[in-house]
Amino acid sequence: MTTHSRPERVGQEIQAAIGQLLTRGELRDPRIGFITITGVKVSPDLRVAQVFYSMMGTAQERAETQKGLDAAKGFVRREVTAAVNLRVSPEVFFTFDESVGEGDKIDRLLREVKQKEGW
């Protein structure tokens, strides 16, 4: 059985709560397109939650999405605090997750090598 620290467990709960907000369409800002919450890192004192997201699109679309998410931070903070039942309301920061794009790039390169080598 794996043991998780409290910040990790709270991060998982925050990720699920924000996912529900997105699924239910409660973030109505048109700048926020189809995004996926890839992870949440919570500070040890539970006062800060860094939310990582990924999306397809151009750099301009990512910038607009970031603006929309930044504008929705207060709403997300209130909803997360209520859903996760926390005494402290964590400050929420949204960060684009570059690792998804890097993973796609690595997959593409591996496929190219496979084709060239005839695997």
From Swiss-Prot:
InterPro entries reported in the protein's UniProt record: KH_dom-like_a/b, RbfA, RbfA_dom_sf, Ribosome-bd_factorA_CS
GO biological process, one term: maturation of SSU-rRNA
Primary location class: cytoplasm
GO MF annotations, alphabetized: ribosomal small subunit binding
Pfam families: RBFA
SUPFAM superfamilies xref list: Ribosome-binding factor A, RbfA
Record keyword Cell division present: no
Keywords, ordered alphabetically: Cytoplasm, Ribosome biogenesis
Subcellular location: Cytoplasm
Keyword Lipid biosynthesis attributed: no
GO cellular component terms listed in the entry, alphabetical order: cytosol
Family under the similarity heading: Belongs to the RbfA family.
Main function: One of several proteins that assist in the late maturation steps of the functional core of the 30S ribosomal subunit. Associates with free 30S ribosomal subunits (but not with 30S subunits that are part of 70S ribosomes or polysomes). Required for efficient processing of 16S rRNA. May interact with the 5'-terminal helix region of 16S rRNA.
Subunit structure: Monomer. Binds 30S ribosomal subunits, but not 50S ribosomal subunits or 70S ribosomes.
Protein name: Ribosome-binding factor A
